[in-house]
Every structure is written in structure tokens, then in C-alpha cells.
Design a protein with these regions (language model features):
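C-terminal segment of N-terminal export signals and the immediately downstream linker at the start
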Residues: 21-43, 50-54
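Hydrophobic faces of well-ordered beta-strands that scaffold small-molecule active sites
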Residues: 31-37, 59-61, 86-91, 125-127, ...
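Active-site acidic/histidine proton-transfer and metal-coordination neighborhood
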Residues: 14, 19, 45, 81, ...
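Acidic/histidine-rich catalytic cores of soluble enzymes
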Residues: 89, 158-255, 260, 308
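Acidic (Asp/Glu)-rich catalytic clusters
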Residues: 28, 48-53, 68-88, 114-121, ...
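Acidic-and-aromatic substrate-binding clefts and catalytic sites of carbohydrate-active enzymes
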Residues: 37-45, 61-72, 94-98, 133-135, ...
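N-terminal secretory signal peptides and thylakoid transit peptides that target proteins
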Residues: 1-16
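Conserved, mostly hydrophobic/aromatic
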Residues: 51, 59, 79, 106, ...
Length: 309
């Protein structure tokens, strides 16, 4: 038995409650929305309750170690009591780092993240596929759209999934503007190539808007994403995008409701094709901005006939 398998076995008894929560809200016809939430101290009960008080029924994975069985048990139980699904375990490292030792370390980090997702009942563990850039762990590089990149990403995904052998969670690569997967079709090709049931899709439509053509056709891009990927989507990053007019093309992430993404379209497509996947707000500077984004999503959902609570 490998180290990851031993840890997962020890943690498994602590996490049975998570399975009963996973489909409860979806069966009631409601979507799950989440965002970063913090509370003083480290009480899982207080953190889970704070999510519900904010109107969220999905969460980013709390700070918990795979080898801390007691805290794992308390975290899973608290979030289950409050009907808050753990959407994702983020492991933001470069699986294609040019340095071999860093690559090895990063692969172990993501493998541990998938084991933690399995232990907590999170919908997925997510990372980007990586970058060949020597100066930025996520930055652009000519080879990031190459067959070599694709093959390396497939090999890494198989290695991570095969090490953990998850039964109730998935591993995903977040889509990117300048690295594979950079389109719905690229996601489908990667899912087919990895050929593992536990390899899924992490949807971030804003990350795919990398040209004026896609910016102007963003709603059709959103529809294409959900139409082609819907059943494979484990979690979704929800944000908005604007075009800062300069001498070169410059798209910028902004708070939902202040950009160009039609959330009426996005939420309707989400409800139709991927209702079980949590929608997670991200990349905002503080609580006030998250509260405003939350309100904008709920308002758009109301107009689209979609509810969250």
C-alpha cells in the first residue's frame, strides 16, 4: 500500500457524511454558489456556518491536512450538517516546471491534493496543466500549445489519478487562455486521451476569452462549453471580464456585473447542463466585492429562473 493509499484509508472513516450531501441540493433544483470565506480561529463548525450565513452552499476546501484524521472528521461533519459542499482542492503548482526536482515535488503536491479531495468529499482537485515557461509557473510559452505539452499533461493526469484511485472525486485541469486546454474541444481531447473516469473538467469561461472574436461571442462560447462539456464539469470559476482599450488587446477580470459576460446565459446553461457543479467566485479583493458579486449572480439567476437557496 502506498503512502497516499494509507493516508486515504485512515481518512476514509472520517468522511462518510460527505456522500449524503453531494446531491441533496441539486435534486431540489437549486444551484450551489461559493466564495472564499474566513472566520477567526480554526473551528470547522464556525466556518461552515459562516458560509451559510453568507448565502453560500459551496466552499473552497478549508485548511486541513490529510494526516490530521480528527480535523478531517470534524470538517466533513460540520460542512455536511450545514449542507455546504466542498467544491475543490486547489493545488496551484507547475507540473511542467523546467526543473526536474521541482516537477517531481509538484507532482507529489497535486497527488496529495487529490487524496485530500477524496478524503473530504470535494468535487475535485484542480491545477493548471502547467507551463514550460522558465520565469512564470503559469505564464505563456510557445510550447504550451504543442503536442509535447498535451502529451506531458496527459501523462501527469494519469499518474496523479492512478496513484490515488479516487472513487468519489475527480482531478481537473483548469482551462487557460495561453495553455492547453484552451477550448471546449481541447478539453474533450484531453479527457479522451487521459482515459480515466476520475479525470473531469474544470470550467472557467473567462479564461477562454483570449481574442476579440471570443470576447464578442462570449455568450456563444459559454453555450458551447456547457453543451459539449456539461456532464464532465466538476466545478466552475465564476467571474467577469472587461476590455481595457489600449494599443494592444487587454482583457481584465472584474467583479461579476461590471463586465461583459452575460450571467443570465451562463446560469441558464449551467442549470441545464451542469446543475451539480458548484459555481465559485474568485479573484476579488475583499468581502465587500464578494458580497456585490454574490448579489449580482443571484439577481441574474432570478431573471433566468435559477435559484441558489
Amino acid at each position: 500500500m502506498t503512502t497516499i493509499e494509507r493516508r486515504t484509508f485512515l481518512a476514509g472513516a472520517a468522511t462518510a457524511a460527505a456522500a449524503t450531501v453531494a446531491g441533496a441540493a441539486e435534486s431540489a433544483g437549486r444551484l450551489r454558489l461559493g466564495a472564499p470565506v474566513s472566520v477567526p480561529g480554526d473551528d470547522p463548525e464556525a466556518l461552515a456556518r459562516a458560509h451559510r450565513e453568507k448565502g453560500y452552499r459551496a466552499a473552497y476546501c478549508p485548511n486541513v491536512r490529510l494526516d490530521d484524521a480528527a480535523r478531517l472528521r470534524d470538517t466533513v461533519a460540520a460542512f455536511a450538517r450545514h449542507d455546504v459542499v466542498i467544491a475543490e482542492v486547489g493545488r496551484w503548482v507547475n507540473l511542467l516546471d523546467p526543473d526536474a526536482e521541482k516537477r517531481k515535488k509538484n507532482l507529489a503536491t497535486v497527488t496529495e491534493g487529490l487524496a485530500l479531495a477524496e478524503a473530504t468529499g470535494a468535487r475535485c482537485c484542480v491545477d493548471i496543466a502547467g507551463s514550460f515557461s522558465p520565469t512564470s509557473w503559469f505564464g505563456p510559452h510557445p510550447e504550451n500549445l504543442s503536442p509535447r505539452f498535451f502529451d506531458a499533461a496527459v501523462e501527469n493526469a494519469r499518474a496523479i489519478v492512478d496513484a490515488v484511485k479516487p472513487k468519489r472525486t475527480t482531478f481537473c485541469y483548469e482551462m487557460m487562455a495561453w495553455s492547453l486546454p484552451d477550448s471546449p474541444d481541447a478539453c474533450l481531447r484531453m479527457v479522451k486521451a487521459v482515459d480515466r473516469k476520475a479525470f473531469a473538467v474544470h470550467l472557467d469561461p473567462c479564461n477562454l476569452v483570449n481574442s476579440p472574436t471570443r470576447y464578442y461571442a462570449a455568450s456563444e462560447l459559454v453555450r458551447e462549453c456547457y453543451r459539449k462539456l456539461g456532464p464532465l464539469v466538476a466545478s466552475v470559476h465564476a467571474k467577469d471580464l472587461t476590455w481595457d482599450v489600449e494599443m494592444a488587446v487587454h482583457f481584465r477580470e472584474v467583479r461579476i456585473g461590471t463586465g461583459s459576460i452575460d450571467y443570465g446565459v451562463l446560469l441558464a446553461e449551467h442549470a441545464r447542463h451542469a446543475p451539480g457543479a458548484p459555481l465559485m467566485l474568485e479573484h476579488l479583493p475583499g468581502d465587500a466585492e464578494y458580497d456585490a458579486a454574490h448579489a449580482a449572480v443571484v439577481a441574474a439567476g432570478r431573471k433566468a429562473g435559477v435559484t441558489f437557496d
